[in-house]
Swiss-Prot record:
Pfam families linked: HrcA
UniProt xrefs under InterPro entries: GAF-like_dom_sf (IPR029016), HrcA (IPR002571), HrcA_C (IPR021153), WH-like_DNA-bd_sf (IPR036388), WH_DNA-bd_sf (IPR036390), WHTH_transcript_rep_HrcA_IDD (IPR023120)
GO terms assigned for molecular function: DNA binding
Role description: Negative regulator of class I heat shock genes (grpE-dnaK-dnaJ and groELS operons). Prevents heat-shock induction of these operons.
Gene3D superfamilies: 3.30.450.40, Heat-inducible transcription repressor hrca homolog, domain 3 (3.30.390.60), Winged helix-like DNA-binding domain superfamily/Winged helix DNA-binding domain (1.10.10.10)
Protein name: Heat-inducible transcription repressor HrcA
Alphabetically ordered keywords of this record: Repressor, Stress response, Transcription, Transcription regulation
Similarity-based family: Belongs to the HrcA family.
Length: 358
């Protein structure tokens, strides 16, 4: 049995507080619910091989409900696990296996395509998880720590400018910017020269901190158009922790494929709203960066998903030297197939880390 890295600590009854009968019935209810998505009745448990009458099973299920581990939705006679119950099941009962060899080969083959950019590889990893695990695949890009080697503004026409930043580690980042009226080739060159003289060798974090006090000087040294380009360029590259990072989400349509999800459009709509809160979701995945393995959040364990009642299973991806780069995971309904999704997330994160290592 695998002990998992939990989400935030939530007070739930411990296994020691349940006798053998209660533990067995609780496990069977949760396993049946995760498989079918339907509330589980006492007769279902009785037919599953429990040597107790339906009445005795109902009494035990009632006791589990009073402990906050089971709940009865609407007027249904059946029971389903609460988020607290799912947390106890994941931490105390869940047995996690390994990823099938065929799936391992598929993950490795899709991530090993040559000529793919850094962000394309991350997007592919997110799509892989979405397809294999169901739910939406999510990945947050690393904090850029390499020093800046070169900066350039390239006119594209049609009112757009391409801001190009080349890093000392060979990575290139491009940002499309609106071209203000009156921008001339000389203003673009002037802005490029100004930034190259001051950013070369600095990380984006250092640049964001140190350049703040230099913008006033930039306005005095440059013409107004070039100064605005410098300011807009810095904002495009490093305008704060949320804006400096990319969040990639794939497979949101999977969240509508579940039969129960179709019955609860409000919950799905709330989940889509949650996914649109980019900065908060990046913050959640940044917490995963500090974890030593897979991290699981269930429902109200995060403020972000407290209303939609969704679950997040995520893991950090890192280099061979154990330098954490970012985090990748799956978001879906609370009844995700944890035994299947957890190893998929873990293996994809490890393959992605190896690929980023070159």
């Amino acid at each position: 049995m695998t002990q998992l890295f939990p989400g935030p600590i939530v007070r739930t009854p411990g296994l020691a507080e349940l006798d053998a009968r209660a533990r067995d019935i609780f496990r069977r209810v949760v396993e049946s619910y995760l498989e079918t998505g339907e509330p589980v009745g006492s007769r279902t448990i009785s037919k599953g091989g429990v040597a107790l009458s339906p009445a005795s099973i109902r009494n035990t299920m009632q006791d589990l409900a009073q402990l906050g581990l089971l709940d009865a939705p609407h007027t249904s006679a059946g029971r389903m696990p609460t988020h607290a119950g799912l947390r106890m099941f994941v931490d105390g009962f869940l047995e996690v296996g390994d990823v099938a060899e065929q799936e391992k080969r598929a993950i490795e083959a899709r991530l090993a395509v040559k000529g793919r950019s850094f962000e394309e590889a991350l997007a592919e990893a997110s799509s892989i998880l979405s397809g294999l695990a169901g739910g939406a695949g999510i990945v947050v890009t690393p904090v850029r720590e390499g020093g800046v080697k070169h900066v350039e503004f390239v006119p594209l026409g049609g009112g757009q400018v391409l801001a190009v930043m080349v890093f000392e580690d060979g990575q290139v980042e491009n940002r499309l910017m609106r071209q203000a009226p009156g921008v001339t080739p000389s203003a673009l060159q002037e802005a490029s020269n100004f930034l190259n003289a001051r950013l070369r060798g600095r990380t984006l974090t250092e640049a964001r901190t140190e350049m703040g006090g230099e913008l006033d000087a930039a306005r005095r040294q440059l013409n107004e158009t070039a100064a605005r380009l410098v300011e807009d360029g810095l904002a495009a590259w490093s305008g704060g922790e949320g804006d400096a990072r990319s969040l990639i989400v794939r497979g949101q349509a999977n969240l509508l494929a579940d039969a129960r999800a179709r019955e609860d459009i409000d919950r799905v709509r709330q989940l889509f709203d949650d996914l649109s809160r980019r900065a908060q979701l990046i913050g959640l995945l940044d917490d995963v960066r500090d974890a030593e393995g897979v991290r699981i959040y269930i429902g109200a364990e995060t403020r972000l998903f407290s209303l939609s009642g969704s679950s997040v299973i995520a893991a950090p991806y890192m280099t061979g030297r154990q330098k954490v780069l970012g985090a990748i995971g799956v978001i879906g309904p609370a009844r995700l197939n944890y035994a299947r999704v957890i190893p998929l997330v873990d293996y994809t994160a490890r393959v992605l880390g190896r690929m980023m290592d070159g």
